[in-house]
Swiss-Prot record:
This is IAA-leucine resistant 2. One of its GO terms (biological process) is root development. Changing residue 319 to L: In ilr2-1; resistance to the auxin conjugates indole-3-acetic acid-leucine (IAA-Leu) and increased resistance to cobalt. Disulfide bonds: none annotated. Keywords: Cytoplasm. Its main location: cytoplasm. It is found in: Cytoplasm.
Length: 386
């Protein structure tokens, strides 16, 4: 135990020291807050395995005549854009046009009414802003950025000549598929094979599903499109400039799909800020056989294996964040010798200060986990709701 004299001496020394330094106590270090950092998100792991499972189930198709793979792609594509807008809103990086549209959409379609099927819930949770851990939380947030001008000035241009556009849901393109599908099917005087031959896009569902859906197509009340439609604004790109009513019918299909899968939720379960999975880059490995130019939708010649490495500068990543990043692959770097998109995800240093942190850690290459996705989706499928 310290003596009374030593305690008194310590207090005296401290008081003397403070008296000498009193004029300098106002000099305090202020750590600058770095700007926000962004990445361009990818939807290439979305929906396909679910659609294959649903198309293979006779009971589901019979119970849900409004279902078609294109409708589910349309719904999930719209939600992908909306969730990215929510993340952008969290970091105050939306344009006035985007902000007004987001508020209008959520007024018409509250988060609790937007079903998210179980296999996709984790994917949508990764589309958020997140706070880096280092240094001292002074780095700005990391978030998925979408183009302020999502579409071209004319619909018949199909999409913007922008690399990022190829990895975002092409909602006008899905509408083109729907219109193309229904343009031939109502004409019962043609043989199914002849209709398929005249269609621009071979359909991966069976022909009976296409024909049954044609009878339900008018239920959706989709707006009439024109080649001259300007798709530069988000409301026009998502086909909601004049009315959002058609989306209610699409939501009904999504409700039926979500009810058929374990672990489903709503967009209200997907916070616009939270998971640090978006601080992990999924670097795709060069496949043994490079993809070829596709001639139609879902052309297998354009597909490739999804071997990958995980890379990040974060030192204390939760295991769940790494698993979610690998499963959802919403933030990717394409392998450099892809014949069309080899530079996607490679130029990150100009996307904000977070990407300049070093060193970068890496995982081992995983060449097999992606093969389990179809079985994971099938295991989550409960069958049509009764």
């Amino acid at each position: 135990m310290a003596s009374e004299s030593s305690t008194h001496k310590t207090k005296l020394e401290k008081k003397t020291c403070l008296s000498f330094l009193s004029s300098f106590t106002r000099s305090q270090i202020v750590y600058p807050t770095q700007g926000i950092s962004h990445y361009y998100p990818s939807c290439h792991m979305m929906v396909h395995a679910m659609n294959i499972t649903l198309c293979d189930n006779f009971d589901f198709k019979r119970a849900n005549p409004n279902y078609h793979p294109y409708i589910l792609r349309l719904y999930c594509g719209v939600l992908f854009w909306i969730q990215c807008l929510r993340a952008g809103n969290d970091v105050n990086d939306l344009t006035d046009v985007q902000h007004r549209f987001l508020n209008r959409f959520l007024d018409n379609h509250p988060l609790e009414t937007l079903a998210v099927p179980g296999p996709l819930l984790g994917l949508f949770k990764t589309l958020c802003s997140s706070q880096p851990e280092f240094p001292h939380n002074h780095n700005g947030k990391v978030y998925p950025r979408i183009p302020a001008q999502p579409g071209p000035a004319r619909r018949d241009a199909f999409m913007r000549d922008l690399l990022e556009s190829h990895f975002l849901p092409n909602v006008p393109g899905i509408f083109a598929l729907l219109e193309d599908l229904t343009a031939f099917l109502p004409n019962t005087s043609r043989l199914s094979k002849e209709r398929q031959a005249h269609s621009r896009y071979p359909k991966y569902p069976d022909q009976s599903l296409n024909e049954a859906f044609a009878d339900c197509y008018s239920n959706f009340n989709f707006q009439v499109t024109s080649a001259a439609d300007n798709l530069e604004k988000i409301s026009s790109f998502l086909h909601m400039k004049h009315s959002m009513a058609w989306f209610n019918q699409v939501k009904g299909v999504a409700d039926d799909v979500a009810a058929s899968f374990e672990g489903s939720g709503t967009l209200a379960d997907c916070s616009p800020h939270g998971l640090v999975a978006n601080q992990v880059m999924v670097v795709l490995s060069t496949p043994e056989h490079l993809p070829e130019s596709p001639n139609c939708i879902a052309d297998k010649r354009a597909t490739y294996e999804f071997g990958y490495q995980l890379k990040s500068t974060v030192r204390n990543l939760p295991p769940l964040a790494e698993a979610l990043a690998a499963f959802s692959q919403t933030y990717i770097r394409m392998f450099p010798n892809h014949p069309f998109f080899g530079t996607f995800g490679s130029k990150t240093l100009d996307h904000g200060p977070f990407w300049k942190i070093r060193p970068i850690g890496s995982s081992l290459t995983d060449n097999s986990s992606y093969l389990t996705i179809p079985s994971i989706v099938k295991q989550a499928f409960k069958g049509p709701a009764t």
